[in-house]
Amino acid sequence: VHSKKHMTRTTRAGLGGRLLSLGAGLCLAGGPLWAAQSEDGDTRLATVVVEGAARSEAQKAEARLKKVPGAAVVVDNKAVEKGRATNAEDVFALQPGIFAQATSGSGANKISIRGSGLNTFYQGYALGIRYLFDGLPITGPGGTQEDYLSMNGIDHTEVLYGANAFDYAATSLGGAINFVTHSGYTAPGNYLRLEAGSFGYRKQQLSTGGVVDDSDYYVSIFHNERDGYQHDTPNKGQELVANLGHRFNERLDTRLIVRYREETLTQGNTLTREQIKHDSNSNKVPTGRKKDGSTWVGSTTTYRFDDDSRLQVGLSVNDYPLLNGWRYSATPQDWRSTDTNLTLRYLRSQDRLFGLPSDTTLTFSSTRSQFADVKSHSRATGQLLQHTDYTGSRDTVFAFGNELQLDPRLWLVSGLSAINIDRDVSIEYSASANTSEFPSAVSYNKWYAAPRIGLRYQLTPDIQLFGNASRSIDPPVTWQLGSTGVPYIRPLTPQKADTLEVGIRGSVGVVDGSLTLYRSWVKDELLSVVVRQATATADALVANSNASPTIHQGIEAGLGIQLWEGANGDRLDLRQAWTLNDFHYRGDSTFGDNELPSLPRQVYQAQLNYQRHDGYYAELNARAASSYYVDYANSLGAPSYTLWGAKLGYQAPGRRWEVFLDLRNLTNEHYATAANTAYDAKGRDSANFYPGDPFNVTAGVAVRF
């Protein structure tokens, strides 16, 4: 993306000048194991019986991700459900390095990890991150459908930053997010949850789960509605989640997961800074999208050859229609897509390589668009305006990974991914003639390599150092090459990045934390710009292109402190997260070293939580975001903001029932939650900002029976 004139970039915060002191650690109580000596003098180990609660699936995932030589976190939904639990903004709060904000308070979310999908627009798809359900991808050649990011029926969520998502065949700059569905083991019994709040928000959930002999089941239904803060922005959805598992014997088990969701959503138009301040619920040009039934069916089967090796076979089908612009748009579009995926994983642990302990993983994942196209029509006449076809496009990854234990404290992690990108995009019909220099069809099949190497060092039993070097490959999704806005296909090349990452994580006493620094040298970054804003008579026009070389670098820091613990078990805890984003051009011929727009330079989050031993809890939280540019010329910035919130609640023993009150934006701040990206705003206040919700309250109650 290039501008027409150069503007001097404002000074960025240097990485070297930003440090966050992190203590680490939780005191673990333990006792000695004494050797018993028999009467004849033989020394034998005494039998020790350890009793305690079994680890949850989220805790098991957290222990597994500690072996990753880079940033990776697990979000347990039990913690999320102590307040409003409706979208990605709720789930990823207090996670450094992750930007997740709802646009206009709706289910459309801007989600970015380390600047991935930097200026994605919000019309049904998410970019820059590989999303999965239970290890099977929902991201395909056309991107990821936002309606699948409802966060319903989830036990926990794994977030692996950048190349640390290697084992999930993720090769994107942002890494991967894996949503793990509840099963009959994690959510037994019957469960009813009701939420209601400001701006007509309502959500209902009813689920049942259990274990019968060698089988387990979980079935849940959801319904959500919201009238909206901006005028005329209602949205509603209903969803079914089912998870059925069966264990045939000690070697073989299988699981079938089904997700079905219907959704209608009306999005408010973006506003100027002046409107954000004085008329933030204005909505002159609403847009709407409708999903009349997205269906994802996935199956995973695991065969254990022995205690140390196993094969996982995954199959999935993803059918996702999208009626974009079904309300108000002058040229509504009908998107129809069906993807299939095959995933194979072979895992070998407790092996030997060069005489050293070794774990090896082989992964194959291929997602193909069996059918994919978009048709646009004139609302006034019903005439077909354009038909663009994407059928046959495919993303395939072969990955080999190994973890080699060099000594009792040091592990070498290496890997290589071979990536095959197949794009087949053609305009089958257009009412407008193609008079541009670009073709009406693009078809290519290319291979890329993405190596990875890292080290993990156990400094103490509770403190870990890590570092890695990697390459990421982000192919353009099909519709970025061309959809219905123009009668030509714009050839785009995959985005490539080389990344260095170092960090520390662990715990000491009552303190735990993590600190990660990274720098990515990006080539051909895929960037978007809103060329024309939507009006009452014309739809928005968004252009995509490969940029000149850019830099993505930053600091991600998290810190947790137990401030106080009473004799009866009452606790006071403070959690903090700080993110520094520094994304900019590298000597662009027009932009120089200008900042890349769309994400805050700094984000600070904090949560002070008081938990009583009898189940009552109270929380005070804060989120502060700095200003950032919304155009490549760096002439117009989003205002900074600070939001305060609070939670009150009670959980009965065993969580048999619970109730909460979630208060947000206590000071009624008028702010922009996210922004579109302009080419050159020329310093003029323009409509690029999504308004955040003012003061709002959500109440909820849940019962297990």
Residue ranges and their predicted role:
Residues 249, 352, 356-367, 389-523, ...:
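Structural signature of Gram-negative outer-membrane beta-barrels, strongest in the C-terminal barrel
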Residues 57, 89-136:
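Extracytoplasmic beta-strand/coil segments of soluble accessory domains associated
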Residues 189-191, 196-225, 230-267, 288-310, ...:
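Transmembrane beta-barrel wall of Gram-negative outer-membrane proteins
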